[in-house]
Amino acid sequence: MGYEKFTWVIKNFSSLQSEYIKSDIFVIGGCKWCLLAYPNGKQNASYLSLYLDGPTLKTLPCGCRRRIRFRLTVVNQLSENLSRRGEGKRWFDKKLPLCGYEEVLLLTKLNAKHGGFLVNNEVKIVAEVDVLEVIGKLDVSKESQEVIKPRKRMRLYGDGGAVSSHLHKETSSVDVNGFQVLPSQAESVKRIFERHPYMALEFRAKNQQLRASCINVLLSLIKTLCQSLQDISIDDLGQTEQVLTFLQNSGFKVDWLERKLEEVKEKKIQEHIGKSRMQGLEEDLKVFKKKCSDIEALLEKEKEELKGLKQKCSDIEALLEKEKGKVLAAAARTPLTFDDIL
């Protein structure tokens, strides 16, 4: 059967007041499911908790069980490589109707301003479920499920602001230059071959799955190079070089992509050098500002001492003038006569 996907967008995440919120119920493999999220953690308030729940299992007779594979992903909307995913395989039954992760993502990372998990105050969660075995009756018959699948279902929770998008799974493919690609990829692949028509002339693989995998690798590489310099590391670029080598060894002529990679690498290196210089200059500025502050403080102290010395000079000058007046007064007195002395 393979995985089927359900996307849940939680709106107004930072203002949620409820202890937990639930998505709409969705149907995969004839079984009803929903997602359960604790915005402030179930046990640890530092983490987002996320669970997959089988809401009807509690009401089904004992012995009813579903064995599934599942993936729960908190999507990084800036870089898919940074998304946080957990996956597992297990039985769901009346006693164990839900499974998930108590600490799926640290809230400081989720709430980071440019972290990519919280965009426009929205958190995007994707559940992928593959029902492997069902013991007991289905919640929804296959016929009913076929009717339900194409319909979009969207509902706002009045107090939580959670929006559940429709169930979807891309199973069809489109041929572009001999490569089977998903409809969502067709336009991008078509543009690549329009700009570089001889890119795959030496690519000899006949297996369509292998051919599709190589195209996926190519698209992922281009997507990586389209990220902002802030979102891509030098290590990422090193891995990108390895991917490029893989494509070249597979027969793809991607010298144009190699040039772009070198351009991005050069810009990233310049950014790294610039940041190092900035850090050094910031440290120098900090030191010189401290010296200026110390000298200014010393100058203020010297000013106070100078002010005191000037005051002392003024006091001494006044005292000198006073003594000088006494001396002049004494000198101007009429001399005593002989008779005055006798």
UniProtKB/Swiss-Prot annotation:
InterPro entries named among the record's database cross-references: MATH-CC_domain_protein, MATH/TRAF_dom, TRAF-like
Domain MATH: 3-129
Pfam family, one: MATH_2
UniProt name for this protein: MATH domain and coiled-coil domain-containing protein At3g44800
Coiled-coil annotated spans: 253-327
Top-level taxonomic group: Eukaryota
Keywords assigned: Coiled coil
